[in-house]
């Protein structure tokens, strides 16, 4: 259908953008220079702990939250830098590490040490757990919606693999 073709084209474009952008070294210096508050948080999903990176906008009113789903490289400096861009636009932006608990030592993306083959295997294993992804996202949405700075509105978006998960989660 036309809708499916458009969706596929959109995902391909986001993947291309994410791949090109992830090769850039702008993200880490951006976070080092930002005046916005950011931190890692742990969100519980039952007994499972999901690590997430959150950046808050510098606004005086309650803000809408953006759950930003990473690409197929995991929660990288690039994904963390994108949370700063979301906050700059006025959103409380949280990026969950959906590889939480999938790393060789039980950690998330950082546990893979930049080994792309290992990350790919982690994503292959994660792909077998769509219910886990959904419940992790439910927990992240519930967490961010209840923050005192949030107005209760939450939107979800993502890049490449994360874009696909966004469509699935909707």
Language model region names:
Residues 17-43, 50-53, 161:
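An N-terminal hydrophobic leader/cap segment in hydrolases
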Residues 81, 168-169:
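Active-site signature of alpha/beta-hydrolase-fold catalytic machinery across serine-
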Residues 2-10:
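Bacterial N-terminal signal peptides that target proteins for export
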Residues 148-159:
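Alpha/beta-hydrolase fold nucleophile elbow
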Residues 10-18:
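Bacterial N-terminal signal peptides
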Residues 158-162, 166:
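Gly/Ala-rich beta-loop-alpha elbow adjacent to hydrolase catalytic centers
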């Amino acid at each position: 259908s036309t809708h499916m073709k458009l969706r596929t084209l959109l995902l391909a474009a986001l993947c291309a953008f994410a791949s090109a952008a992830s090769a850039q070294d702008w993200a880490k210096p951006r976070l080092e220079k930002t005046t916005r508050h950011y931190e890692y948080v742990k969100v519980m999903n039952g007994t499972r702990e999901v690590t997430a990176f959150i950046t808050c906008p510098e606004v005086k009113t309650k803000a809408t939250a953006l759950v930003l789903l990473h690409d197929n490289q995991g929660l990288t400096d690039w994904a963390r830098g994108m949370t700063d861009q979301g906050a700059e636009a006025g959103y409380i932006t949280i990026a969950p590490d959906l590889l939480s608990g999938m790393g060789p030592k039980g950690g998330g993306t950082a546990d893979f040490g930049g080994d792309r083959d290992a990350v790919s295997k982690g994503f292959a294993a994660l792909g077998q757990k769509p219910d886990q992804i959904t419940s992790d996202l439910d927990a992240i949405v519930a967490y961010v919606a209840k923050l005192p700075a949030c107005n209760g509105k939450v939107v979800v978006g993502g890049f490449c693999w994360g874009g696909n998960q966004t469509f699935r989660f909707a």
